[in-house]
Structure formats: structure tokens, C-alpha cells
Amino acid sequence: MSAIGSLIFCSECGNLLESTTAQWTTCDQCQSVYPSEQFANLVVETKSSASAFPSALKLKHSIVQVESQKEEAATIEEKCPKCGNDHMTFHTLQLRSADEGSTVFYECPRCAYKFSTNN
């Protein structure tokens, strides 16, 4: 018998054994027999981290931010380098230190081409 966490496997064939209240546990695959008392005092300790359970609320918050940024985008007369459209939408973010300029993100409404520049 081999145990990995709360799962118990047959030592002969590796089949997963079913837990039972009977005196003996029998492997359904190879018919090996194990005394059930071996499994009675099995202690399982689990550990997890916050990253193992992603927050649905946090994910929703990120999606809302992206959508709100799209709504706040302004339009400028700038030629798209990809399709030649005369207008592009843009928004700015302060990604670098406060004493440096902001980053301008452009997006073409026609072909969805995106690029950014540092001011």
C-alpha cells in the first residue's frame, strides 16, 4: 500500500484503493488484500497559498479597469502607421517616475493597431 496525501494506492498494481469500513481493503484490479487498520490513522496535512485560489473579484476589477480606460480614450488627428486612418484614440498613463513624462497609448479604431510613445 502506498499513500499520497489522502489517496491510497495498491503496492502491486498502482490502482487507487477505495476506502472502506470493512476489516480488509481489496484492490479491484489485482485482488491484493490490505488490512483497513493501516488507513485508519492516516494524517493528511495540506498547504496552499493565496495565488492557488485566484480572486474572482480581483479579476472582475481588472476587466472593469480595462473597459473604463477604453471609454475614456480621446480622439486625435494622428495617422495610423498600419492602415493610414486619419484618426486614432489615445490615453496617457504615468508609468515612469514623477519627474519624467507620461506614456501615451494610441489605438486605431479602424484596424485596432496599437503603439505607445514616451513624452
Swiss-Prot record:
Q: Name one GO cellular component term.
A: nucleolus
The answer to whether UniProt assigns keyword Transcription regulation to this entry is no
Major subcellular site: nucleus
Cellular localization per UniProt: Nucleus, Nucleolus
- For this UniProt record, give its keywords in alphabetical order, as a comma-separated list: DNA-directed RNA polymerase, Metal-binding, Nucleus, Transcription, Zinc, Zinc-finger
Check the record and name the PANTHER family matching this protein.
DNA-DIRECTED RNA POLYMERASE, DNA-DIRECTED RNA POLYMERASE I SUBUNIT RPA12
This chain's function reads: DNA-dependent RNA polymerase catalyzes the transcription of DNA into RNA using the four ribonucleoside triphosphates as substrates. Component of RNA polymerase I which synthesizes ribosomal RNA precursors. Required for growth at higher temperatures.
Quote the entry's note on domains.
The N-terminal zinc-finger domain but not the C-terminal one is required for rpa12 function.
Name listed for the protein in its UniProt record:
DNA-directed RNA polymerase I subunit RPA12
Q: What is the lineage of its organism?
A: Eukaryota, Fungi, Dikarya, Ascomycota, Taphrinomycotina
UniProt lists the gene as rpa12
